[in-house]
Amino acid sequence: HVYPIAAITKDSGGETLTEMADLKLGGAVGFSDDGRPVMNARVMRLAMEIARSLRMPILAHEEDIQLSAGGVMREGAVSTRLGLRGIPAQSESTMIARDVELAELTGVHLHICHVSSVRSLKTIELAKQWRCRVTCEVTPHHLMLTDEDIAGFDARYKVNPPLGFKTDREALRVALADGLIDVIATDHAPHHQDEKRCEFEQAMFGMIGLETALPLCLSLVRDGVISLRELIRRMTIEPAKILGLAVGALAVGAIADVTLFDPNESWTVGDAPHFSRSTNTPFWGKSLTGRVKATIVGGKVVYRDGEML
């Protein structure tokens, strides 16, 4: 199933609000300007007030574009060594702090997308202590990779928010285990190969993640970071709760949306059937363990053993 998230502002420009009530009637389950932040605090406050009245969440990409302008990776020792312009962690954390304050003011449910730094986690932890309606997510690649992986100037590692330090990665894993991070989301961002096979500075941000998310996260189970039960919960039940959807759970009378997987089967990304039209992942050609065997949607088997049915 695909559930639409509607734009907060027209053309995601950050200035003029969309017809949010009409978009809800049209089937939207939340509001977001996707990979663009709403820099205007007044506009964001109004959006939150309307979303609160509609009982809809705001899903925010948190980035101060005045701090991040021109940056291509996390600012730090590695960016300095590589001669690449950095994006400070504060580009994310300062916007999270602003939106947490606005969420407390308006009472909206604020969902913070793809958290990447320990600084951001501290603000989110404080917000939850204040009992603000705040949830957050982390991507598999931020749980697996760091800025040091960019040493070879491979643009497949170029994402936004950028890969953090080892300390950020470890903090994200702890926050996931402790429940501070509510869900795991892929931030799936396909690109044509020409948009990645170029100089790092000119390459587009983003990597694909739908087909590698499960095996990557299963490595966290094997490493003792999180239990299998909790991992499944963070990828199914909890995302559904955030969006107010009556899906994601196995129960009598529930919609039969089920994924069957073998946690021990190894496969090579790219050698096995690949369904995304893009290949922009640093895991291409890597051996991963854990493979989806079948997918059931609405009680109908739509995928089995490498074939779409």
Predicted regions, residues:
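Fold-independent oxyanion-binding glycine-rich loops
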Residues: 5-8, 33-35, 61-63, 115, ...
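His/Asp/Glu-enriched, well-ordered alpha-helical/loop segment
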Residues: 81-109, 156, 177-184, 189-264
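C-terminal cap of metal-dependent C-N hydrolases
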Residues: 199-202, 255-307
